[in-house]
């Protein structure tokens, strides 16, 4: 009887844990969707609201790690790009979320267009990896790594 009770308790714990993880995945997917809806809308404050102070990134052009200590400065810099006429229309494709407690790794392809102030539009397809952490009841991005997607050779 004790074994049966123990198995029932373990089953309930595992079920609750799996349910919580599924909720976390859905919450993170929703956060990432909002992150890019605000980017497309030119809403710098809304976009940066999904970052933590100290956010770091490797951009698609390569280069050194960029660390942003001030969310206010990051918001102002992005808003300046929007005000200059830059427009971004990205979608996340093949989104995958792996949750590790209060941290998660989000991978996807980032596809879409960038329009520069002179009206020239460039199609982009990048690989994107984000590290997000739980901040109270929200998930926030602490790091992103974006690199150009290169088609696999068929040779």
Regions found by a protein language model. Give the residues of each.
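A solvent-exposed, acidic/Ser-Thr-rich amphipathic alpha-helical stretch
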Residues: 25-26, 30, 44-99, 109, ...
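Positively charged n-region of N-terminal signal peptides that target proteins for export
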Residues: 1-5
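Short, low-complexity N-terminal intrinsically disordered segments enriched in polar/charged residues
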Residues: 17-50, 153-155
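A short acidic/glycine-rich loop-to-helix N-cap element
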Residues: 117-123, 151-155
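A short hydrophobic beta-strand element
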Residues: 102-112
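Short beta-strand edge/turn micro-motifs at domain boundaries
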Residues: 105, 125-150
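Beta-strand elements of well-folded, non-transmembrane domains
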Residues: 112-116, 132
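Bacterial N-terminal signal peptides
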Residues: 7-16
